[in-house]
């Protein structure tokens, strides 16, 4: 059995080791958090650069597509019947404008 006074240089550093481990884990956590934030920022920048190009290509493809597709999209967006989105609509535009102008004419019987 060893004599307790045999080696005087060793001391029980249980509390100091626990504190060092805690600091090391805290430092590792901060480093991982910074890396995650950098990755999220990089993904946001990549999306911000990709989305306008994607929209441009999509709009160019849509503009070069058939008018049938454009009519379907216009009917969906404006919630008008599909039949009302064709060339007849353009021809009837003047007639609708005239009926709207006639109905919005003020009557002379008003006070103002």
From Swiss-Prot:
Residues 86-97 have a biased composition (Basic and acidic residues). GO terms for cellular component: host cell plasma membrane; membrane. The keyword Transport applies. The chain crosses the membrane at residues 27-47. It comes from the Viruses. It is a single-pass membrane protein. Residues 80-112 are annotated as: Disordered. GO terms for biological process: transport of virus in host, cell to cell. The keyword Membrane applies. Keywords: Host cell membrane, Host membrane, Membrane, Transmembrane, Transmembrane helix, Transport, Viral movement protein. Residues 98-112 have a biased composition (Polar residues). Coiled coil: none annotated. Its main location: host cell. It is found in: Host cell membrane. May transport viral genome to neighboring plant cells directly through plasmosdesmata, without any budding. The movement protein allows efficient cell to cell propagation, by bypassing the host cell wall barrier. Belongs to the nanovirus movement protein family. This is Putative movement protein. The gene is DNA-M.
């Amino acid at each position: 059995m060893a004599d307790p006074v045999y080696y005087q240089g060793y001391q029980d550093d249980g509390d100091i080791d626990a504190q060092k481990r805690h600091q090391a884990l805290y430092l590792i956590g901060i480093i991982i958090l910074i890396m995650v934030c950098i990755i999220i920022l990089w993904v946001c920048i990549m999306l911000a650069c990709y989305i306008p190009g994607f929209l441009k290509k999509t709009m160019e493809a849509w503009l070069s597509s058939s008018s049938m597709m454009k009519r379907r999209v216009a009917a969906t967006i404006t919630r008008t019947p599909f039949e009302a989105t064709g060339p007849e609509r353009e021809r009837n535009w003047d007639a609708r404008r005239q009926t709207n102008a006639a109905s919005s004419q003020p009557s002379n019987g008003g006070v103002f």
